[in-house]
């Protein structure tokens, strides 16, 4: 049931993001998912592609670069999850610039490799995913912060 809810949330987010001409995919995996999500057949291809892109090239900080960020988010019980964030384009940010969601539940920041990390991801509720999507739009200048 939890997996089904995750997939539905991803589908809802994908639909909303396409409507705004922004593709945003968030795949959050439990720490014990050593296969990086490959056991979920619905997203296995996306995970493989994202990992291949991430390993194949170093990203330049460019306004028109597709970025795939893989980050580990530490959680209270020393639990970590792999987070894969794919965006269509990204803006160039200084290393210390951050964009917080309006409720401060998450923030976006530029990684060393030029990717965007979303942290922390505490749940998979639709409201949370919408907040992340809005933050990415703010980052791209599509919304005023």
Labelled PLM ranges:
Residues 2-4, 10, 17-50, 138-145:
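A structural "domain/chain start" motif
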Residues 25-30, 69-71, 84-88, 111, ...:
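A structural detector for beta-sheet-dominated domains
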Residues 29-32, 75, 107, 135:
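Secretory pathway export signals and precursors
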Residues 34-45, 82-88, 99-104:
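Surface-exposed flexible segments
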Residues 45-59, 112-117, 121-122:
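Generic detector of solvent-exposed, compositionally biased contiguous segments
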Residues 52-53, 57-89:
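A short, hydrophobic beta-strand-centered structural micro-motif
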Residues 90-94, 107:
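Contiguous, structured surface segment used for ligand recognition
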Residues 99-145:
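C-terminal/domain-edge helix-coil "capping" segments
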């Amino acid at each position: 049931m939890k997996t089904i809810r995750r997939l539905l949330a991803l589908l809802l987010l994908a639909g909303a993001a396409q409507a705004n001409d922004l593709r945003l995919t968030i795949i959050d995996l439990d720490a014990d998912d050593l296969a990086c999500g490959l056991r979920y057949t619905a997203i296995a291809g996306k995970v493989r592609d994202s990992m291949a892109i991430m390993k194949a090239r170093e990203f330049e900080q460019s306004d028109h670069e597709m970025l795939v960020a893989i980050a580990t988010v530490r959680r209270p019980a020393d639990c970590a999850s792999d987070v894969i964030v794919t965006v269509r384009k990204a803006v160039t940010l200084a290393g210390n610039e951050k964009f917080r969601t309006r409720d401060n539940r998450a923030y976006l920041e530029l990684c060393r490799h030029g990717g965007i990390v979303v942290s922390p991801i505490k749940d998979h509720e639709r409201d949370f995913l919408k907040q992340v999507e809005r933050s990415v739009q703010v980052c791209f200048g599509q919304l005023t912060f």
